[in-house]
């Protein structure tokens, strides 16, 4: 136990010791973009499911007795909604990404990934057997160059391209049209993590890769714990890939299946996304307002999305700014290494339907004042 004490003490000395904190103030921190996590329609769907006997827990792995009608119904509905051949429901986005990256790329393959992909992708790649190469953020040309160099070096396997469609800490968007063309030219597989776009962006909230769904070389991941307000993740892919995951993915095979009640919740969230487009429209109006106001009052160029990073560089300043905003009643968290690269500590402002323009304007006023008064 001493080594754990020593490591925690070292984190404390560097002011990087983390602790859980309560949910306080106006929500500018969560990923509940459409405010579905406690939506009345979601509640009614869950109550109705309980009344008709849907169980709390799955009772086992999907390959044993844990495969429930609700899982299969969700996967069928999700495949139709996203426009893919098949979908597979995992317990979390982390588990799904780990499953994909640890299993699918083979020893002779190459994975070219954006340097800012999620930690779960990195863990999956470390557990996998393929060669993995990072490229500069949003640099499609570097992706093409990396695959060409690998082929010139004698690479014979499958090339894989891994990106997020909307990046969780920067709020910017991957150049998917260019990447899709590069994937086609190299007969590469394109893996797109839609975690922060699902339900919010793309045609009908289907994500930013919606135009490419259904292609044999696309695998997309849609998390269910952000805009969909529930838990889990849906992997969308050709039937062959889904069948391979069912048969070979250890995180899928050896884990208790997600609660059937959560499958019901995700299914209801997808239906709400379809029948209530005004939620997305309201959010996009708030996004446009906040981006304009942030530029006008703080001199900070907005990301254009619902994720607004305020990059201040130093860790101490980021955490002081966060504390000031929290004291004023705004739940905004400071983000620092190792979550983001060294020298890019920031505030991560997330816009959700839990706030309106009035609250957002007041928050930006407080932020502008804090930026002026707190030393750089």
Describe the predicted segments one by one.
Residues 40, 44-48, 52, 80, ...:
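PLP-dependent enzyme catalytic core of the Aspartate aminotransferase-like
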Residues 257-276, 282:
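Structural motif of enzymes handling amino- and sulfur-group chemistry
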Residues 44, 51-92:
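Conserved N-terminal alpha-helix of the aminotransferase class I/II PLP-enzyme fold
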Residues 204, 212-244:
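Active-site PLP attachment segment
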Residues 100-119, 140:
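Conserved PLP-anchoring active-site segment centered on the Schiff-base-forming lysine
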Residues 131-133, 137-192:
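Active-site phosphate-binding strand-loop segment of PLP-dependent enzymes
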Residues 36-37, 282-288, 295-329, 343-344, ...:
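Conserved PLP-binding catalytic core of the aspartate aminotransferase-like
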Residues 1-57, 188:
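N-terminal "arm"/small-domain region of PLP-dependent enzymes with the aminotransferase-like
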